[in-house]
Each structure stands twice: as C-alpha cells, then as structure tokens.
Amino acid sequence: GSEMCIRDRDGRLAYQVDYKGTPVINPSTLGLELKGATSLMDGFKVVKTSTSTFDETWQPVWGETKDIRNHYNELLVELEQPSTTRFMNIRFRVYDDGVGFRYEFPQQKNLVYFVIKEEHSRFAMTGDHTAWWIPGDYDTQEYDYTESKLSEIRGLLQGAVSDNASQTVFSPTGVQTSIQLKTADGVYLNLHEAALVDYSCMHLNLDDKNLVFESWLTPDAQGNKGYMQSPCHTPWRTVIVSDDAREILASNLILNLNEPCKYDDTSWIKPVKYVGVWWEMIAGGKP
C-alpha cells in the first residue's frame, strides 16, 4: 500500500509518498503565495501533529458500485508562522491506493480575508516517467492525449495543440489534470484533485530539468487565483498509485475525498440519456 512521511525543510513543510516501500513522490515542498501579504511558503514551525483512523462504508446516489469503503489514516499538521502570527494546517489522508492533502486556514485575527496569487504544491517525480497528457489550457480540454516521456513534453506541446476557437496554453510545459504516469518499474501514478468548491481549477506546470510538477491555478480576469475567508480550506490534491493500471480507474479515492451529498431527498435524481445538440450543429449529423 501507500505510505507518506513529512519533514521540515528550514521552516517549509515537505512530504514524500512511498508505494510498497519504494518512493513514488520524492520530497516535495508545499505552500501558498499571497497577494499583497507575506506568503505562506516558509518560516513555519510545527505547533502540533495529530493522527487518526477512519473507516466507513457509504452509498452513492448512483454509481458503479452500491457500497464504497472510505478507509484512511489521517495526519493533521498544525503550523504557525511566528513572524506574522498566522496559522495554517495541512491535512493528509493516506489510503491503500494513494494520498490526498489540503491546506486549511483556521479562524484567526491575522488571516481573515486573503487573495491567493499562486499555490505552490509540488509533486517531485522519481524519474523521467511515461506520461499521458493534454496541454495546460484555461479554456478547453478538447485535445487528444499525447504519450511521451516527461522530458519530451516541451518539444511536443505546440504540436499537441489542435485547432480550436478558444485556447490559452499557459506554459510550454503546462499540462492539465488528471495526468496519468507510468514509472520504469511499472508503477502507475495519477495526479488530480477532489472537492473542488469555491476555488480555482488546478493544472500542473513541469520543471523539466528537475522533473517536478507544481500546481498552477486558473486565474480570474485580474490574475487572482483564489478569494478566501477563514475558516476555509483548499480542495484536496490527490496522488493515486498502483502497479495495475486498471486499479487507477477503479479507485474511489477521489470520490471519498469529495464532499458528501447535501441533499436529504435524492429520489428525484435519475440517470437519463442525452443527445448533444451541440455536436449535431457542428458535425452536421455525420457519424
């Protein structure tokens, strides 16, 4: 299964993910850059850590399986930035098939309303993996997937941008999530997110010299990437791991990290068939 360890790198928190005793995510730093304020990147001290275990079985309204088991070990790291007297927590959940983590901001007088300039969550790869990716684009996901080594993304990205009316490719090494990866040892990785609510969608930008992915959030018209009011939290960042590619697709990790259904009565929710009129318009009824 999956394991995770946390370390303090000169006041900056880093995490590592192992699978069956072998690293699949090398030590990767975490933090957020704020607009017009001291960033939540470093200068932290660990105030408290706590662990817990959770195990439940729940039923989705509709889905591939009737019952879904939500079983994880949790680590909550409570941080203080003494120079600003601000507090931030990072919550990690470790499943058999991967991990999820998110930033949490408790209610506090020195961090109430704040604007995120960029989130700097890193995912350090352990090698030049094979990747299945589409270009990082704020406006469309309608691309064919490209299979290549991580080191080849830069050279292939422009050729992977198909003709489309709305395109904003943000970086020569930017890709969208979810991204699927395969190591030389046959271990599969998937990087994505869960519980995306009132926050920007996460893309990934690759440092192709060091083979490190870093989160890259979709901006608004002013270039801001998140408007926050504590107490609040970010979406979960997810890493699914397996030596069987089919298990990546079968994983319930993201479903388990999504927020529970808020409707008391779900009897009115029914699956339906949908005919896409948009495709009828642009394809002219061609098969």
Mark where each language-model region is:
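Conserved catalytic cores of very large enzyme subunits
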Residues: 265
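N-terminal accessory beta-strand-rich subdomains and adjacent acidic, glycine-rich linkers
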Residues: 2, 7-262
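Substrate-binding cleft of carbohydrate-active enzyme catalytic domains
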Residues: 268-287
